[in-house]
Design a protein with these regions (language model features):
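Acidic, polar-rich low-complexity tracts and alpha-helical solenoid repeat scaffolds
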Residues: 4-7, 16-166
Length: 166
């Protein structure tokens, strides 16, 4: 009886973690397939399994980026997309997707969340970290569009500072 109970517990454990025997590449392919079928939660689960089970694999950073991209482009949850892109920048700072993630953070703040100060901060951080990157012209374009907004922000801050000093 005890052996049957142990066997049942083991089988339940295996069925709950169906991704445990899959390679990072298999999980990546599953995540991509689920996404193409619009099974977004399954896709995210596959990508999270890569991050959890293969944290040092090159696909871990790409999986984190894909999660952020799903929230940005598929679910349109822009705040959560920013959080997920921030994880890429924090956890994988040297990976190729980190700089694109930093750009996307600024882009989302500017174009979707209307958090212009945050957009300016992140665009300037991008310029500082990647001064010769191919995205610099896009960063400059976005910052140019934010100049008037920045002037308004500065003016409002000046008014607030004057009132608090009275």
């Amino acid at each position: 009886m005890k052996n049957i109970l142990i066997l049942l517990i083991g089988l339940i454990g295996l069925s709950c973690n169906g991704n445990s025997n899959k390679s990072a590449n298999q999980l990546w392919n599953d995540g991509q397939q689920f996404r193409s079928e619009e099974k977004l939660m399954e896709s995210i689960t596959s990508f999270k399994s890569i991050i959890k089970d293969y944290p040092l694999d090159d696909l871990a950073a790409k999986a984190q980026f894909q999660i952020a991209d799903i929230y940005l482009n598929d679910t349109k949850d822009f705040e959560f997309a920013v959080e997920e892109f921030e994880k890429v920048v924090k956890e994988y700072p040297e990976h190729e997707v980190s700089k694109k993630s930093l750009f996307m953070i600024a882009y989302i703040y500017n174009n979707y969340l209307e958090a212009y100060s945050d957009a300016i901060i992140n665009y300037n951080l991008f310029k500082e970290k990647y001064p010769s990157d191919e995205l610099i012209p896009s960063v400059e374009y976005e910052l140019e569009g934010l100049k008037d907004i920045q002037a308004t922000i500065d003016s409002l801050n000046s008014i607030v500072n004057k009132k608090t000093n009275l």
